[in-house]
Swiss-Prot record:
GO annotation, cellular component aspect: cytosol
UniProt keyword list: Cytoplasm, Hydrolase, Protease, Thiol protease
GO molecular function: pyroglutamyl-peptidase activity
Function: Removes 5-oxoproline from various penultimate amino acid residues except L-proline.
Reactions the enzyme catalyzes: Release of an N-terminal pyroglutamyl group from a polypeptide, the second amino acid generally not being Pro
Stated name of the protein: Pyrrolidone-carboxylate peptidase
Family, as annotated: Belongs to the peptidase C15 family.
Enzyme class, broadest EC rank: hydrolase
């Protein structure tokens, strides 16, 4: 039985809710074909985010980890391709920390690629009628910080990891200015992604690039 650890961030900024946390709560304990989902709540705090997930990994000993965060402006579930070694926070984190152009890990590589089968994940999510696409930027806030930090932590292990950004919930954009997705659809997309990880030891060959 392969455990898939899926983490969700707490609310941050002016939001009272974070769809990442709410979605993972909905699928906590879900049984998969050959696996199960376990979850972890993550603080939107620079170094505490990494330490929290590291502790969950040590406790759960998962086969793979999906770290999840919200991304305003996105209309689809978007597995991230790459994490970069830069913290450049546009807003403070939840403890008031706001850093500019500092490394996530001093002396670390410029970037890490995901070790999840992101194209297979996207394909399986799309097959169920849920919008999904590969993303080539995880930003420079705590989402990318966590993505990079956990990739660095797991680099010499067989534990697979990657980050997935998800849209806002309808209640987070009552004026309709931002694309949204229903909570149940987000949760189901994450569960499908978890199953795709179990089913695919390597990624599929399928175009997912962009011009810019």
């Amino acid at each position: 039985m392969k455990k898939i650890l899926i983490t969700g961030f707490e609310p941050f900024g002016n939001d009272k809710i974070n769809p990442a946390l709410e979605a993972v709560k909905l699928i906590a304990g879900r049984k998969l074909n050959g696996g199960e989902i376990v979850i972890c709540q993550v603080p939107v705090v620079r170094y505490k985010s990494i330490e929290t997930v590291k502790q969950a990994i040590e406790e759960q000993q998962p086969y793979a980890v999906i770290t999840v965060g919200q991304a305003s402006g996105r209309a689809a579930i978007t597995p991230e391709r790459i994490a970069i070694n830069v913290d450049d926070f546009r807003i403070p984190d939840n403890e008031g920390i706001q850093v500019i152009d500092e490394p996530v890990v001093a002396g670390g590589p410029d970037a890490y690629f995901t070790t999840l089968p992101i194209k297979a994940m996207v394909s399986e999510i799309q097959a169920q009628g849920i919008p999904a696409t590969v993303s080539n930027t995880a930003g420079t806030f705590v989402c990318n910080h966590l993505f990079y930090g956990i990739q660095h932590y797991l680099k010499d292990t067989n534990v697979r990891h990657g980050f997935v950004h998800i849209p806002l919930l309808p209640e987070q954009s009552v004026d309709g200015s931002q694309p949204t997705m229903k909570l149940e659809q987000i949760a189901e997309g994450l569960a499908i992604a978890a199953q795709a990880i179990i089913d695919n030891d390597s990624d599929i060959q399928q175009g997912a690039g962009t011009i810019c």
